[in-house]
Amino acid sequence: NIAEACKGFKNHPTSILNFLEGTRRTSAKQLNQSSDYKNLLKPKIGGIEYVIKDMGDYLHKLIDVTIVYPDGTPTFWQFVKGECRSVKFVVSHYDIPKQVLVDNDIERRSSLSGWIKTIWMQKDQQITEMTQTTNVP
């Protein structure tokens, strides 16, 4: 239960991992989802919304990690076996906006959705720029 976990986190320095795409992106998943993004699936904000609702006053930053495989996305087993020769990471830090920390559920969800959409548009453009000079499909 997210709410129970968040109660325990309030008493300790904590980092919470949340994967907004929910799964690894494939071309088929992207087509099926009718994503607005060239390189990303639509973000799912339900999990992060619960965390912000329960821990908003305790959270200060969102750290976004973008991972790009210049030689093409490996399968899990290729990655584990070391057959992935190159991986690029971009780490971005964002202050959590005050309008995302409001008590009203509707306002919070709307603000959070808009904020994440802005981050996703920047992230999508960043991936496009990173892959223009490589062979990533």
Summary of predicted features, one role per range:
Residues 1-7:
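A Trp-anchored, charged/polar loop motif used as the substrate-binding/catalytic surface
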Residues 10-103:
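A cross-family acyltransferase "interaction/gating" segment
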Residues 102-137:
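Accessory terminal regions of nucleic-acid processing enzymes
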